[in-house]
Amino acid sequence: MLDIQLIRHNLAQTKQKLALRSKGLETLLDHIFELDFKKRSLQSEIEKYRALRNKQSKEIGLKKIKGENVEGQFSELKKMGSRIEEMEKELIQFENQINTLLLSLPNIPHDSVPTGGPEANKVVKTWGEPRQANFPLKTHWELGRELGILDLERGAKLSGSGFSLFTGNGAKLQRALIQFMLTIHTEEHGYKELWPPYLVTEDCMRGTGHLPKFALDMYATDKDNLYLIPTGEVPLTNFHRDEILAESSLPLRYVAYTPCFRREAGSAGKDTRGLLRLHQFDKVELVQITKPENSYTALEEMVSHAENILRSLNLCYRVVLLASQDMGFGAAKCYDLEVWSPGIQSWLEVSSVSNMENFQSRRMNLRYKSSSGKNILCHTLNGSGTALPRLVAAILENYQKEDGRVLIPEKIRTYFKEEYL
């Protein structure tokens, strides 16, 4: 959530910066500005009435001591109290309106972010070479079916389209990759592992910016008003919601494996074949909570942590700096990591690493106490380290052999215990 001070004191500049993300926000910003002006005017009026009431209350007290008649003044005092109550209710309405509108605004892009849509995305790094083969390469769904490790038909029978079902060595590969990634992130990168709930409250979803903006993309339980998490970012970032952290404890680094659940309401026209776009998928998520001055160093660090996973698996990948209109709702700056999948001849996003600055912490009331005793909003960052379905797809397509077998990447054989699928 944006700071109301930006709109109150720098409206023109805020309009200019948010226009880089989306057109049509000027009217909304003007409306927030007007509501805030009315709210502050009402606050001033309430304060004047309170001061007058206090003054008259003291006068009545002195007159009563002297035995003077205060019936008329007491009646006026009661009317004034009723008027203050009415104005306070009106003030709450203004505050609720403003907060609701602020929740609908995206984050302001960092100055280093390219301007524009997906066409303005910038490839900042490429590692490895796309695989070349002297035989026709199969797609991951063909390999999965032929090896008997991926049953999309039965997944659909159980839950409908958009759900996968791994069997035998396919399930074993998933488990090996999860264990491998968690080991790397905890032992080499210094993250603390959490095993969080997969159902969270509305406050948690609002805290990370998934509500109210993406309500239609979420799976919700109506009776309990709980939401299935769309990403491990939600429980990990909300872990310290409504807390004041010690400055010495920062940065905090958390990692967790979780399944993720997304309705993908806006996926029409996108490639949904095989493992490319699912309603339920597995992911290892990274979150850091930092001081503001350290968050952009942490962002580059988190990108390198996700890269380490891909390099360890010897997968060709590229790092893409997303443009202002292609970033996630709450991101100030975001990198995507994409692996080359030769069977489908496409780059697949397996990680998205974002600096949210204080966009989430303002929503979550997440602060730290500085050495001067001041409570300061933390910066939060999140990233996939990495997502499983497309990583599995890339491994199957990159490591396939002409005889139909798939070589297991060397780094995960310790967990898989076999050389081939």
From Swiss-Prot:
L-serine binds at residues 231-233, 285, 384. CDD domains: SerRS_core. Its EC number is 6.1.1.11. It is found in: Cytoplasm. GO terms for cellular component: cytoplasm. ATP binds at residues 262-264, 349-352. Pfam families: Seryl_tRNA_N (PF02403), tRNA-synt_2b (PF00587). Keywords: Aminoacyl-tRNA synthetase, ATP-binding, Cytoplasm, Ligase, Nucleotide-binding, Protein biosynthesis. It comes from the Bacteria. It is an enzyme of class 6 (ligase). NCBIfam families: serS. Homodimer. The tRNA molecule binds across the dimer. Consists of two distinct domains, a catalytic core and a N-terminal extension that is involved in tRNA binding. This is Serine--tRNA ligase. It comes from Methylacidiphilum infernorum (isolate V4) (Methylokorus infernorum (strain V4)).
